[in-house]
Amino acid sequence: RNNMKNNYPKLHNATWPGIVGKGPDSEPPISLDTLLDLTVNAEVDGVKFDGIDLGLFEPHFNIDESDDGIKRFAEKVSKLNLNVGSLVAPIWGGPAMGSKEDRAVFVDMVKRSCRFGQKLKEYGVRPSGIIRIDSASKPEAWSTDPVNNTKLIAATFREACDVAADFGEKLAAEGEICWGGMHSWTAMIETLESVDRPNIGFQADMAHTLLYLLGYNSPQDRILPENFDWNDQATLDAGLKKLTEALRPWTLDFHVAQNDGTVHGTGAHDKTGRHCQALDPNGKLDIAKHAGFWLRNEDGALTKAFKHICWDGCMFPNEVMTKQQTWNDILASMIKVRDQHGWYEAE
């Protein structure tokens, strides 16, 4: 192996943890500027974050920001030596299996997000990344008519894919137990297959996908045995191997995360995989090792399916999120992932 340090995948932080699960019945949101400062100031042995992934929602962003406004933001991140990667489309006002009007709202929000993303590309700060979606529908509602609801979600995603294709964008559905039609690994694959478009894929979050193993909202899709002992590494690895072999071919985007095997929701957010801090002693994942299950094929070869990876850690208390050390620890975990499963490209 050459002695050049791996410089891919690029290491990104996320803006949405400053908003998700925050609000009136929780803690106040953390400002975009604060998150940018914490990102830029994180450093481990001279290595820093390469970029940020954005949640395109208030109070951080106005999805209909003028070209000039987007340009100003592009100049700002550029001055901070950051790029932008993937964007979260604010689709929750339009459930993908809802009414005709709901579904039109969903597709329109994807369109607006694609336009925002295209402008960032045009202004030279977004070399890679996808538009992140989910079904914006609850598993309980989905389960009243699984076959037709999956068809409806797939039809909405298909329309959204065609709109995204006009902008040269790919859509990635983030598999979480709290989204109908995406609430289990088998439901997720069925939905993706039903969309039948080349620009649809999966966003794998290490915390959320761990709960797929437990069949949390779909007991029949459980992979790990009942009363599984978390000290049994071999069984955990075998479960993750099965899961990643099924979902890896669909994976277009990746969230490095830690999870303690439990679910969590604060504010207006439904219960979903609990994100843990990078060094949480209760974390069930060996972050660097288990990231490799997603970043390498069965034969051990790197997939190189995406040019950046992003940390996702939502619903931490503000006190934790405004400490610089939190982000240094996160960055250190991500550097380990890149050291073990990254590659070098001359730039």
Predicted regions and their residues:
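Active-site cleft segment of glycoside hydrolase catalytic domains centered on the general acid/base Glu
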Residues: 139-157, 163-164
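N-terminal pre-domain/capping segments
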Residues: 1-127, 148, 158-159, 165, ...
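A short, acidic, amphipathic alpha-helical segment used as a generic capping/interface helix at domain edges
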Residues: 37, 237-243, 281-304
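Acidic/histidine-rich catalytic cores of soluble enzymes
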Residues: 154-276
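Hydrophobic faces of well-ordered beta-strands that scaffold small-molecule active sites
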Residues: 7-14, 50-54, 84-89, 129-133, ...
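Aromatic-rich peripheral "rim/lid" segments of glycoside hydrolase catalytic domains that contact
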Residues: 270-271, 276-287, 310-347
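Active-site beta-loop-alpha junctions enriched in small/polar residues
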Residues: 14-18, 54-57, 89-92, 136-138, ...
